[in-house]
């Protein structure tokens, strides 16, 4: 068995039968990624400003040459053997399918750290590939580097020295992006400097303004290298044969001249001698720089282009990372100089998280879904603003605009990268909300066009008000609140316009309510109702903070009335239903998107008496925000019990699903909506037969908050069993596209189980009085909290591992609270010790 890294944590182990679907994204926030496949292969080159599933891109692969003493040398591709199916029109279809690989391979991960172990009886070395990209909470720049770090560890278990070479090869594909384009004038050159040496890939034939223009680099920190800038230009696959023969001869490459090519392949070889019983490491950096990102909503103005090739305004939005680095070589030099520190900071985070006492499935669900932040789902424009698709199609983004009703559910951004969350809030309120209070639930870019979409989603808009409260609390930024408040107030007041969501201003949404299931609900229902109640509570608190007492009182009055009405009229003894009510007056402009019912006298696509999986999503969010109960506490708990009873399936063999399939056969799941007592509309709410992980996590986390721990954990475990590497990719939970944003609701399980809450406004932190080691993060600082029993009391060690934490109060909920005489500042590396007595 090949040894694993001594200090890198591992959450999940995947054997050779569970590798086929693994593709771990390597790259930074807003940079795109190259994925590490389960066999140790590089795939899905999604670095050219768009998704590109299946795109071979640089056709990169790494090869080991090894000679033990006087024995014949062996050469192997540093990948596990190919798995069936092998069939294709011209034989096997994998890249370089005929080359020999390692017979034994396994994958081990705790995102972003991945380890691939290789062994083969014919190879005198055991090999471990260690791959990662820096991920540091509260440091989006350190977590946003366009690099894949690949470290090959060679271990000699024999009794003679082994001469070894690890060689990486990379095709210059600049000009292609996986969907189209043309690579022209590729130019590869060997460089050395800044602690690295290797190949710099550029182009002389692609327009520098094109979205597909950029640079690549393959470098190493190893001192002894040989290279080949370009494989020879000949037919019949002779270039691959020439490369293989050259390396296999003596483990070194000869840089022979080659005729000019548009897509030259370059190779970089690093050499080392591995002593008997010894271990040597060779580190490679794959870096990229494609600065010309285009808007997702191309302007149709004359001269504006289509958004695919034009590199000028109004369609170019650029990439923030490209403002931090001049080209791919600059990325390599700057990363190499900080590599030790970046790895240490990433390790500090991942180790602290993995060593916490959270259940295994919660750690895995929370950590694996952080990969979505680095996928093409998310990006940062040149001005540093953060945006996101809903998810990614195979070749294009899916559902543009930082869609409010989807991004409402996820919690990872706010609690790990608070500055990015604040960027979203500023765009939503200061750019996407018009003077009347209508918030476009999809943002057009550049931000000067943010209101062009011009349609509002009831759940999306209310959720953004709750998120404004959450992010104000986490940051403690009163200036931000005052800046956002006029538009926050307008966004809530928009509910009360004639023909609006709550035109009679009674705290209950009855109007035309577009929502996250892509239709309009007509009449009161629990999903829109709880988002609205949560927004009223959040606005009540924010209004009080800015000195708007009258508006605060209005919000409070409508919250009380709405809460009582929903409990009295929608709760059926088991769960909350929708009371379908066709519109009786003209619908206000901007509320009807057009994807729902066309005949409004008996509207289709309603919930009716159904049991909706996320019917209490607003209450879930209220718990995250610390806003308390929006509805009767016993009704809330009973509803979660009913969702588990009616929507959970121990298998799906008999389940008929007419839409997308994200779970099937022997898999367990929570269905979107069921009709346990009949009454299903002929055309019910869309997706009702489906399964989607973001909704499952929302319900599961809410169960955890309500004390239904075994039920919540069972739901989370059911999700993660479906993403086991053999059935699906553990690092890609799909919904409307790959790497779907909503799935990061999984992070909220960390909050629910630890009871973590932080207010930067009151400088107060709280945890549940639960023994163990807990991980915490507020988006601006992070660390651990250890709670240990001493007789009838509890000893607390609050440690800050990153950022600076300011505190006036610390509490263990329903146990004890400590109030400090002055503000305590706890910096990274410091701890606070407290002795707390139970009541």
Question: What is the predicted role of each segment?
Answer:
Residues 1-7, 13-15, 22, 115, ...:
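Acidic/polar, glycine-enriched structural segments that form the non-catalytic walls/loops
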Residues 394-438, 461, 482, 486, ...:
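Active-site core of glycosidic bond-cleaving carbohydrate-active enzymes
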Residues 1-82, 356, 366-369, 374-376:
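Beta-strand-rich N-terminal accessory domains
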Residues 146-155, 792-800:
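Short beta-strand elements of extracellular/lumenal beta-sandwich folds
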Residues 63-67, 73-77, 84-91, 156, ...:
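Aromatic-rich carbohydrate-recognition surfaces in CAZymes
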Residues 21, 41-43, 49-129, 136-140, ...:
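Non-catalytic C-terminal accessory modules of carbohydrate-active enzymes
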């Amino acid at each position: 068995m090949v040894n694993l890294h001594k200090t890198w944590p591992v959450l999940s182990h995947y054997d050779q039968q569970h590798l086929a679907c693994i593709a771990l994204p390597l790259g930074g926030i807003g940079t795109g990624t190259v994925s590490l496949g389960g066999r140790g292969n590089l795939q899905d080159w999604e670095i050219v400003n768009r998704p590109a599933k299946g795109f071979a891109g640089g056709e990169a692969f790494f090869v080991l040459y090894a000679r033990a003493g006087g024995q014949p040398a062996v050469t192997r591709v540093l990948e596990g053997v190919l798995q069936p199916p092998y069939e294709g029109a011209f034989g096997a279809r994998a890249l370089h399918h005929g080359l020999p690989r390692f017979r034994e391979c396994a994958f081990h991960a705790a995102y972003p750290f991945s380890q691939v172990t290789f062994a083969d009886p014919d190879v005198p070395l055991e090999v471990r590939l260690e791959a990662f990209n820096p991920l540091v909470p509260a440091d989006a720049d350190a977590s946003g580097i366009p690099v894949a770090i690949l470290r090959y560890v060679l271990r000699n278990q024999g009794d003679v020295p082994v001469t070894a070479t690890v060689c990486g090869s990379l095709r210059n594909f600049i000009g292609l992006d996986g969907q189209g384009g043309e690579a022209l004038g590729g130019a590869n050159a060997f460089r050395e400097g800044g602690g690295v040496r290797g190949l710099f890939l550029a182009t002389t034939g692609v327009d520098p303004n094109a979205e597909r223009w950029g640079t690549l680099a393959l470098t190493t920190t190893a001192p002894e290298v040989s290279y080949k800038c370009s494989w020879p230009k000949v037919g019949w696959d002779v270039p691959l044969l020439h490369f293989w023969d050259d390396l296999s001869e003596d483990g070194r490459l000869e840089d022979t001249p080659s005729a000019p090519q548009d897509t030259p392949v370059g190779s970089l070889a690093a050499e080392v001698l591995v002593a008997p019983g010894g271990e040597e490491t060779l580190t490679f950096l794959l870096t990229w720089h494609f600065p010309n990102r285009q808007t997702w909503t191309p302007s149709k103005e004359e001269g504006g282009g289509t958004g695919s090739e034009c590199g000028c305004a109004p369609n170019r939005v650029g990439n923030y990372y490209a403002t931090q680095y001049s080209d791919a070589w600059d990325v390599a030099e700057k990363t190499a100089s900080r590599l030790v520190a970046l790895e240490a900071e990433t390790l500090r985070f991942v180790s602290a998280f993995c060593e916490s006492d959270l259940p295994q499935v919660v750690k895995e669900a929370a950590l694996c879904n952080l990969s979505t932040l680095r996928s093409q789902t998310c990006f940062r424009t040149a001005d540093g603003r953060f945006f996101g698709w809903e998810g990614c199609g195979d070749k294009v983004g899916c559902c543009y605009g930082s869609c409010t009703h989807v991004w409402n559910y996820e919690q990872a951004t706010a609690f790990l990268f608070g500055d990015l969350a604040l960027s979203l809030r500023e765009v939503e309120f200061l750019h996407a909300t018009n003077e009347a209070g209508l918030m476009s639930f999809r943002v057009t870019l550049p931000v000067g066009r943010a209101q062009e979409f011009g349609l509002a989603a009831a759940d999306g808009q209310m959720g953004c008000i709750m998120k404004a409260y959450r992010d104000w609390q986490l940051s403690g930024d009163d200036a931000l609140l005052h800046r956002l408040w006029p538009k926050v107030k307008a966004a809530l007041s928009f509910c009360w316009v004639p023909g609006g969501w709550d035109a009679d201003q009674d705290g209950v949404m009855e109007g035309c309510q577009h929502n996250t299931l892509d239709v309009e609900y007509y009449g009161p229902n629990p999903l829109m109702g709880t988002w609205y109640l949560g927004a009223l509570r959040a606005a009540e608190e924010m209004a009080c903070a800015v000195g708007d007492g009258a508006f605060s009182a209005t919000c409070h009055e409508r919250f009380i009335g709405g809460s009582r009405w929903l409990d009295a009229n929608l709760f059926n003894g088991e769960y909350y239903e929708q009371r379908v009510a066709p519109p009786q007056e003209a619908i206000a402009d901007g509320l009807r998107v057009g994807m729902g019912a066309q005949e409004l006298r008996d509207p289709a696509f309603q919930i009716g008496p159904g049991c909706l999986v996320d019917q209490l999503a607003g209450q879930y969010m209220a718990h995250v925000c610390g806003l308390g109960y929006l509805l009767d506490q016993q009704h809330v708990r009973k509803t979660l019990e009913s969702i588990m009873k009616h929507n959970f399936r121990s298998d799906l063999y008999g389940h008929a699903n007419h839409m997308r399939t994200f779970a099937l056969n022997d898999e367990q799941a929570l269905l979107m909506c069921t009709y346990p007592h009949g009454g299903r509309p002929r055309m019910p709410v869309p997706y009702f037969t489906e399964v989607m992980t973001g909704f499952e996590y929302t319900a599961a986390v809410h169960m955890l908050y309500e004390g239904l721990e075994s039920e919540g954990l069972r739901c989370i475990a059911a999700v993660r069993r479906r993403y086991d590497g053999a059935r699906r990719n553990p690092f890609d939970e799909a919904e409307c596209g790959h790497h779907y944003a909503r799935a990061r609701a999984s992070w909220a399980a960390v909050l629910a189980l630890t009871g973590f809450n932080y207010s930067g406004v009151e400088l107060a932190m709280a945890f549940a009085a639960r023994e163990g080691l807990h991980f915490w993060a507020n988006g601006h600082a992070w660390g651990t909290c250890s709670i240990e029993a001493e007789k009838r009391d509890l000893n607390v060690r609050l440690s800050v591992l990153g950022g600076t934490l300011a505190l006036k109060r610390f509490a263990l909920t329903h146990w004890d609270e400590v109030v400090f005489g002055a503000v305590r500042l706890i910096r990274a590396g410091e701890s606070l010790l407290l002795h707390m007595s139970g009541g």
